[in-house]
Amino acid sequence: MDNRQSQIPDHKSKDFLFLQLRDLPYFRAFLRAVESSYYQNLSLPAPVYDVGCGDGHFASLTFDQKIDVGLDPWHGPIHEAKKFGAYKSLVEADGAKSPFPSNHFASGFSNSVLEHIPHIDAVLKETARVLKKDAPFYFCVPNTRYLSELSISRVLGKGYTEWFRKISRVQHADEPEIWRERLERAGFNTEQHWHYFSPASMRVLEWGHYFGLPSVFARIFTGKWIISRTEWNLWLTKNYVSKYASPEPLEDGTFTFYIARKK
């Protein structure tokens, strides 16, 4: 078993940064663009299981083929996911109580979801149950540097760090050793991981929560995060964040991508 940081796929067939910027506030878009690129050369044999599919936006941009099943416990987002057409089937259910039989799916993924789940051990165990033996399971989560690299914490201290953790709903910002133990208990082997998203990128994301307020008002009044999705309108934003959207693995990256496999 190789748990060392590994090289990531290098696949640039799509301009994921522009595609994400068209629909999302920039501080979410440039992180999702990095993550979209990672899946391009990863094997996802069908049937595929997406744990925490949300509104389906990420899958609709990341994958050319429809994902077999998207599961999410939240009523609003999963019904919104229908409009993207990225899934063959959508299921509203808790990840700890999946309605599928054991050994059903040939692969699975969970993109930037597991860090938000309080009952993480139960969800991982249930995910392992519905995956076939040797099925790959891919996921990405923030690590400890997600919180330790916050710029405003240097002035306001731990109170701000805890506040930021709460507003971003992060329950688990842990290092690979912790995730490896969780996965082992649930029935997975951890094959590879890499850190990504530099501390500087994390600070751009942090400040984006405040500079991105106009997008919130646009969403409230128009139903869209971005009013004008044209390339010329997004050129300056893309030019600025592109230098922070590198997919290269970094020793001090603030997020971690994992490749696990069902035992």
Predicted segments, located by residue:
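Conserved class I S-adenosyl-L-methionine
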Residues: 138-161
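A short SAM/SAH-binding and catalytic strip from SAM-dependent methyltransferases
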Residues: 107-118
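Conserved N-terminal segment of class I S-adenosyl-L-methionine
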Residues: 1-101, 107-109, 250-257
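A C-terminal cap/extension of S-adenosyl-L-methionine-dependent methyltransferases
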Residues: 154, 192-263
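Acceptor-substrate binding/catalytic loop of class I
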Residues: 160-178
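A SAM-dependent methyltransferase catalytic signature shared across enzymes that methylate proteins
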Residues: 179-194
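A short glycine-rich, Lys/Arg-flanked "PGG" loop and its adjoining helix->strand segment in the class I
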Residues: 121-136
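Short N-terminal helix/helix-N-cap motif within the alpha/beta-hydrolase-1
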Residues: 117-122, 149
